[in-house]
A protein has these predicted regions:
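Surface-exposed intrinsically disordered loops and tails
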Residues: 13-26, 94, 102-106, 116-117, ...
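Generic secondary-structure transition motif, activating predominantly at the C-termini of alpha-helices
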Residues: 20, 32, 80, 96, ...
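Residue-level detector of intrinsically disordered, flexible termini
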Residues: 24-26, 35, 93, 111, ...
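Generic preference for hydrophobic/aromatic residues in regular secondary structure cores
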Residues: 13-22, 114-117, 121-127, 148, ...
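Substrate-binding surface in catalytic domains of secreted glycosidases
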Residues: 1-88
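Acidic-enriched, low-complexity/disordered segments with a strong bias for Aspartate over Glutamate
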Residues: 15, 59-63, 83, 107, ...
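Acidic/aromatic/glycine-rich contiguous surface patches that form carbohydrate-binding/processing clefts
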Residues: 122, 127-192
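Hydrophobic, secondary-structure "cap" segments at the distal end of domains
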Residues: 76-144
Length: 192
């Protein structure tokens, strides 16, 4: 959730009125104390990351016939992939690695794409346009009256050259279309 940029000073306790930036937790607390004083420009946003995420299973296995421990929801080790020095990377990084690309499947429990390489000992997960759409529609169905914005973070991690085979900028295009749908055509929780 992204807090409103402009808040009524009535929402803030005196010690916060002249502090910039106001911490998110304090802003949310202030908003809950006096919702009648919310600015008419108050809005909420869902932030969508365009990067994928690397995990190493805590308990590896070498079973060649299936995911085994290389799936979402299994315990993970706390280590970072040494060749990228962080847990997230552009999705193209994994899509151009044949062992990951050939193993990509949609995990229907977590609504995410997952690929793995048991020799390397890593799994990679990201949201496709379809899994993002399903998650956002499910979230919207739970709060139908709430107007929200969709914010794409790390858009440089989007596949703009179609190396993953899902279409160039497929997730950003879907987010734009879904934002317009939510703003102008969404009527009930049955609209999934």
């Amino acid at each position: 959730m992204i807090p409103p940029t402009l808040l009524s000073k009535e929402l803030l306790t005196p010690d916060l009125q002249n502090v910039y930036p106001v911490r998110l937790a304090n802003t949310i607390w202030s908003m809950t104390v006096n919702p009648a004083a919310w600015s008419s420009t108050t809005s909420f946003a869902v932030s969508i990351g365009m990067s994928g995420r690397w995990y190493r299973p805590r308990d590896t296995d070498s079973d060649p016939h299936g995911l085994g421990n290389y799936q979402l929801g299994k315990p993970c080790a706390s280590e970072q992939r040494p060749d990228i020095q962080q847990q997230t990377s552009p999705i193209v990084f994994a899509c151009t690695m044949p062992s990951y690309n050939k193993s990509f499947k949609v995990d229907t429990t977590f609504q995410a794409v997952v690929g793995y390489d048991k020799v390397e000992g890593w799994l990679f997960t990201f949201d496709s346009a379809e899994t993002l759409r399903k998650k956002l529609c499910e979230a919207k169905s739970n709060v139908t009256a709430l107007k929200l914005n969709i914010v794409a973070a790390n858009i440089g991690s989007e596949d703009y050259t179609n190396q993953c085979g899902l279409g160039p900028l497929s997730r950003l295009r879907m987010l734009k279309a879904l934002s317009l749908y939510f703003a102008h055509n969404y009527t009930s929780s049955a609209d999934k």
